[in-house]
């Protein structure tokens, strides 16, 4: 497929971009002291080599009161030499680079700024930090605006091609703009015109300082998705005024960090928020960028072709595959490693204070350290198991010049990833397996399906190395009645879509248990097509449609022994999963132990004592156990044996892919 819109150039003031692909600012955690590091330079250099048109880096704190540890600092001249090294590297590889000017306001943690209170438009408590900021005094406001100006000047001096003013996501400019965080009674509060004043004045000052030709971007929320706050209507008015004040390019996102409307998780449909960019585009004369959940060139091309935006962002898409633009441009889209919006390596890591990585790209953030180089000697490597660990190992070893044979006992590759196909909002995870399969095929890895690796078969094949990546098998707890006819494993249910009764109890509140509950609770709810039909034809009231969306034909209960369900679900995705389960009426019982199963349900014990939960079907989601017996069986038959992925220890997909890749580099 060709992408004529995606790879057409565009000029923003004096900045010419070779294509319409923008990598938005991401908190990466690669600059622990604020100084540019080799890690940061190598990361962005690889994306520039991969063909991105514009890379926006940041957020870059403009002062010492509105940032956090690990961000790229722009608040002092001493950071300029390091930033110059970064901009030179990116531009030497054919891309343009911009700096995002960041002031978090009430989203700043006081612990990050020496215990001082963060600043904001008003003293309104932040649900993100749990802290209440102090309202800026009237005479303090010009000084904060001047910090934006000073940071912008530093950015230009450091070689950045443009700056982006951060006016979205609930940060400081958003806080002045919104009636729920701006309760001021002076000229910066009250009417919408007054609430716009802080942002518009800031933009005007930056424009005046940088001159008429230097590109200035504005990151703006097309809708705050906060009750009582600004919608696309207000965003359009603000954008029109911002353009008059000096903005050349609008980068449109949605929501605040406090919003309960998911923005980036897997359950958000691709291109879901293009309509926000389209709204801003109707209000301004300059170009507009559409953000969020655009992670492949086909989707990006459609956004541009349909007039939804003039440019598109692919931040996590480029974290997953730095070469995405070049692959699309040269007809190799099939070999793109797609972001699947899992958040395991990026957002989950950042929110836990760790540097960002990527589930599907273990080199992310370690570009210089983890390079695929030819092996000293080609060897015959047998990989047993076609899940993510085995496939990643096979691809990496093949790239290094080894003769690789991949053997899988089932009739298809993918392992446990394929179980996600049936789960609403999780189906995109299957893309990770599809991408690995495409790369196996492209590299010419010999693949044998429907063949169990036995000691005798391995002996005849005579490999130099055997890598056991056979995954795991579901655990079977020792409970009375566990072998009953009404008991099934969650894995079997998801793989084979086994029919259950109307009342279902799931034993285990881990990720598999909760996602199985989501799968079952959605059965019988309205499909998107039917919902669209009924809405267009006004066949039912909104209340009836909501009820039909929220209730299926099964009553689902999850039983979990520990205090909290979903302990193995990522922090940045758990809230969406739990919200969906609540919406669908799934009951979750914690600190509840299963003691027996009968034909009529599950006997449990909790703090109140024993009780019985009626159920037609009991689904087991009680964890898994490593499948690695083969390693012991062939221990004296081959020169070298390794065990990776869930066969070593059941964990998540990120760990499986990382282990496969890292072992592949050492063989």
Predicted regions and their residues:
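Flavin-dependent oxidoreductase catalytic cores
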Residues: 1-384, 388, 393-404, 412
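Short connector loops at secondary-structure junctions
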Residues: 63, 218, 253-257, 408-423, ...
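Flanking helices and flexible, charged tails adjoining ferredoxin-like Fe-S electron-transfer domains
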Residues: 203, 367-376, 399, 403, ...
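Short, contiguous acidic/charged loop-to-helix segments that flank catalytic cores in large enzymes
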Residues: 263-269, 371-373, 378-379, 419-431, ...
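Rossmann-like dinucleotide/flavin-binding elements
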Residues: 304, 378-407, 413, 448-456, ...
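Helix-enriched interaction subdomains in cytosolic or periplasmic regions
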Residues: 340-354, 458, 462-479
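N-terminal Rossmann-like dinucleotide/flavin-binding domain of flavoprotein oxidoreductases
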Residues: 415-463, 562, 567-591
